[in-house]
Amino acid sequence: MFSLQDLCRKNTFFLPNGFNKHTLQLLGLYWKEHGSVHRVEKDNIMIQNELVLSINDALLLAGEEGDTDVVQLLLLWEGNLHYAIIGALKTEKYNLICEYHSQIEDWHILLPMIQDPETFEKCHDLSLQCDFICLLQHAIKYNKLSILVKYKEDLLNIRIRHRVQSLFVLACENRRTEIIEWIGQNLSIPEPDAIFSIAIATKDLELFSLGYKIIFDYMQRQGILQLSNGLRMVVLNRHISMAIDNGLLPFVLETLKHGGNIHRALSYAVSHNRRKILDYLIRQKNIPPNTIERLLYLAVKNQSSRKTLNLLLSYINYKVKNVKKLVEHVVDHNSTLVVTILLEKKINLIDAVLTRLVKHSTYFRVREFIQEFSISPEKFIKIAVREKRNVIIKGISEDIWENPAERITYLKQIVHTIKYESGREFLINIIHTIYQSYSLKPEEILKLARFYVKHNATTHFKDLCKYLWLNRGTESKKLFLECLEIADKKDFPAIKNIVSEYINYLFTAGAITKEEIMQVYTLEYAMY
């Protein structure tokens, strides 16, 4: 009989109709008040050769009835014990639960399988190491709102009120919309803004929108919706920043719908280089050109990407009305990319930027700009002369022409191109400081002396003559005669007086004759 029972209980087949109740009981294939039971497929059973149930559904029913024999049979057919336990909990058949209690390591595993809130709570109560908050956490996790409703008064108790925040966050993380709404309507949430952070992190627009409903409904109930307008804008601006930072256009639009500031959204889009968001907002909101130009200044200030700058410039057809303002931002924030972009469109701001750089910036910044845009030394030096920036001229000219004589030569050439006298004098002063700082060859000094005479640089020429007389003496006769001739032709009396003094020295020393002097002097020097 044991072998037959074992065969019948472990195999899939149809029972003969001739088996009576007693035989079925002996075989262990009889279910009280239901009739015969046998396995017909891997996961199914048949009751009384008519009703087909899944093994786990049958376990649930057997558990509800507390029928340990049938449970044992169904477990033999690879059923899940958890269903029997759940059924037993539902009808409080604790004898069956006690029999299998040791086989359940963690009662929390059963919770997602339970639909009925009361059974859910009974199951959780079997986890003796857990507390009340643990029950609420799992109620949220498995969407059992009725359990939270049941314990509403406990949640309002000051002793556990501080746990509401963590429960709210858990509901948001698990996207339990009904529970989130209920918490918002019935409990005080210390930091409701957490819902927005979670919504953005999970890209859940529905949750994001629900956050506004919770916050504004709360303000409405408290009668502070209008009074809290300032706080409201702070919150909305923060949400705009979060949404744009993550590149979430729908979230930006949702915030704007609830009163967010379009200008703040545009500014954040520029600052975060969110070109697609920026493009959409400009087109859809009909942003005027003067606002776009202000956004361009912001883009320059934040050193935005080429794409962002190009987008903004394209909306104003690359025509900047307030060039001065743009140049200020380029220089003040060392952001020259916009200059490059405009140059590609045949709009040249190099001179304007260089002028402001020379006027307000450092030697290193100016040098960097000159190198970046391959600016000629003459252009830079003329601007620096106009702005009286002698230190920058000295520094950069030294970088360009390391040899002092070569440096003086090129600076002298630039002096010839400057049309206003004060500018020429300023650059000649710089040339003279170079002469004073280095030892030039005699021939270079002679060239410099002639240059000073041609430009009536009296003080510097006098300084040079003194040097020549002390170091070369009568060897400078030819130079003095040439300088006298130039000064006479250009009518530079001060220069003539200086030269005359040294010619007198030469004459006294017998190094020059009266005839040589007469070849140069005009009639006023006939006395010689």
From Swiss-Prot:
ANK repeats lie at residues 54-83, 261-291. Induction: Expressed in the early phase of the viral replicative cycle. GO terms for biological process: symbiont-mediated suppression of host innate immune response; symbiont-mediated suppression of host JAK-STAT cascade via inhibition of JAK1 activity; symbiont-mediated suppression of host type I interferon-mediated signaling pathway. InterPro entries: Ankyrin_rpt-contain_sf (IPR036770), MGF_505 (IPR004858). Belongs to the asfivirus MGF 505 family. Plays a role in virus cell tropism, and may be required for efficient virus replication in macrophages. Interferes with host NF-kappa-B promoter activity mediated by TLR8. Mechanistically, inhibits the phosphorylation and subsequent nuclear translocation of host NF-kappa-B RELA subunit downstream of TLR8. Promotes the expression of the autophagy-related protein host ULK1 to degrade host STING and inhibit the interferon response. Also inhibits JAK1- and JAK2-mediated signaling and thus negatively regulates the IFN-gamma signaling. It comes from African swine fever virus (isolate Tick/Malawi/Lil 20-1/1983) (ASFV). GO terms for cellular component: host cell cytoplasm. The keyword RNA-binding does not apply. Interacts with host STING1. Interacts with host JAK1; this interaction leads to JAK1 degradation. Interacts with host JAK2; this interaction leads to JAK2 degradation. Interacts with host RELA; this interaction inhibits NF-kappa-B promoter activity. The keyword Repeat applies. This is Protein MGF 505-7R. It is found in: Host cytoplasm. Pfam families: DUF249.
